[in-house]
Amino acid sequence: MSQSVESRTRIKSERYESGVIPYAKMGYWDADYVIKETDVLALFRITPQPGVDPIEASAAIAGESSTATWTVVWTDLLTACDLYRAKAYRVDPVPNVADQYFAYIAYDIDLFEEGSIANLTASIIGNVFGFKAVKALRLEDMRMPVAYLKTFQGPATGLIVERERMDKFGRPFLGATVKPKLGLSGKNYGRVVYEGLKGGLDFLKDDENINSQPFMRWKERFLYSMEGVNKASAAAGEIKGHYLNVTAATMEDMYERAEFSKEVGSIICMIDLVIGYTAIQTMAIWARKHDMILHLHRAGNSTYSRQKNHGMNFRVICKWMRMAGVDHIHAGTVVGKLEGDPLMIKGFYNTLLESETDINLPQGLFFAQNWASLRKVVPVASGGIHAGQMHQLLDYLGDDVVLQFGGGTIGHPDGIQAGATANRVALESMVMARNEGRNYVAEGPQILRDAAKTCGPLQTALDLWKDISFNYTSTDTADFVETPTANI
């Protein structure tokens, strides 16, 4: 009894003094906090303003992303305030960087509505990124408790079911984005789809910004694209698909387009990240109900994920999108034209594909994560890749990926079908070499040259793009190892 009185007295004297007191003193810092299995954990990279103690800055982030405001409020006493306060429990300096710190924060599960990415993000990234106490702030990683994950649907279809529907096993999926992304008529667009699929690709896809413009309305695109899919499937004797982008201005429009895509026989539809978390979850629920694969283009992500000191690491987006329920997400190529450190991208892929992940600091995984049996998301590698890189792509990314060669198919001098054939032959020759036990990474260029002896389109592709690489040092690399972007 005496301890209870003493505890209440301490809380009242330290936590509920009127006016403005430090966040750490208000209880948002607790170095002795014992993490619960049901806690949501977040890791922030903080850059405090000059003169701001990193512990106080961490406590401020914990407070402002949970229950605090700038001054003490007596209405906290009407809540289970000790439970609901987020707790910053650990602060580490960032290796080899001055004035940056990793702040570990724990949130009670009851702070979040079940099954809502929108509610989760309203707290975790809602106000704190504009907080004056920090010069910059970045959300690096999160751990979701199993109890919380069980309130989410997860991927509508998942990798295993997609492979069964497509009847494609033992190799990556092959795809391409229609180019140019804007300006084609419906008939010409459908011709591109047909040529690419007939040449050997599994998928063609719309790009992120093709919706329903004056040069080609959405229904026209859907009809001509599916005509191409059906003709190519019949000619090749394989199951083929085209990602029909149903992104639109309103949910009503997206529903209409998605339902029409189903009516005309598509097995997959597509949305953009920019439609927002609630719309993404809504379309994922629709996709599962209608047995459709749901592809997500990460349009817009680099506006907040690329810079190392402020914004949000893409691995967090990967986690949220697996919870939200998409089946595909663009997650980097390593060797292509877009940002992508090898270790960082490996961390993204593991986040999307593994049932459990352990702490792996070189890959940027700060927490162990049990995915509570949520289905796997298929990563998509797209942007500046070509047949001559096939050994690198297979080595870095493995089998469970969609390799999308847009320009690397449609830019082929002998035509779209030839470009698709070059990519299919390159992939199958590399997979065969791997399955035979050869060192396909070291022997990759020779394996491709040998395959090209009986495949003219592949020889043309190798000659055309042999000197093309995008070997820049990534802006976002692991803090615990030096890993320049590799393009051998």
Swiss-Prot record:
Record EC number:
4.1.1.39
**Gene3D superfamilies tied to this protein:** Ribulose bisphosphate carboxylase, large subunit, C-terminal domain (3.20.20.110), RuBisCO large subunit, N-terminal domain (3.30.70.150)
* Modified residue annotations for N6-carboxylysine: 205
Compartments it resides in: Plastid, Chloroplast
Q: Which CDD domains match?
A: RuBisCO_large_I (cd08212)
Q: Known catalysed reaction(s)?
A: 2 (2R)-3-phosphoglycerate + 2 H(+) = D-ribulose 1,5-bisphosphate + CO2 + H2O; D-ribulose 1,5-bisphosphate + O2 = 2-phosphoglycolate + (2R)-3-phosphoglycerate + 2 H(+)
Q: Which UniProt keywords apply?
A: Calvin cycle, Carbon dioxide fixation, Chloroplast, Lyase, Magnesium, Metal-binding, Monooxygenase, Oxidoreductase, Photorespiration, Photosynthesis, Plastid
Which residues of this protein are annotated with the site description Transition state stabilizer?
Answer: 337
| A molecular-function term among this protein's GO annotations | ribulose-bisphosphate carboxylase activity
Any single Gene Ontology cellular-component annotation: chloroplast
Which InterPro entries did the record assign?
Answer: RuBisCO (IPR033966), RuBisCo_large_chain_AS (IPR020878), RuBisCO_lsu_C (IPR000685), RuBisCO_lsu_C_sf (IPR036376), RuBisCO_lsu_fd_N (IPR017443), RuBisCO_lsu_N_sf (IPR036422), RuBisCO_lsuI (IPR020888)
Q: Which NCBIfam families match?
A: PRK04208.1
- Which family is this protein grouped under? Belongs to the RuBisCO large chain family. Type I subfamily.
The record's annotation in PANTHER family points to: RIBULOSE BISPHOSPHATE CARBOXYLASE, RIBULOSE BISPHOSPHATE CARBOXYLASE LARGE CHAIN
Its job: RuBisCO catalyzes two reactions: the carboxylation of D-ribulose 1,5-bisphosphate, the primary event in carbon dioxide fixation, as well as the oxidative fragmentation of the pentose substrate in the photorespiration process. Both reactions occur simultaneously and in competition at the same active site.
Supply any other comment.
The basic functional RuBisCO is composed of a large chain homodimer in a 'head-to-tail' conformation. In form I RuBisCO this homodimer is arranged in a barrel-like tetramer with the small subunits forming a tetrameric 'cap' on each end of the 'barrel'.
> Could you identify this protein by its name?
Ribulose bisphosphate carboxylase large chain
Gene, per the UniProt record: rbcL
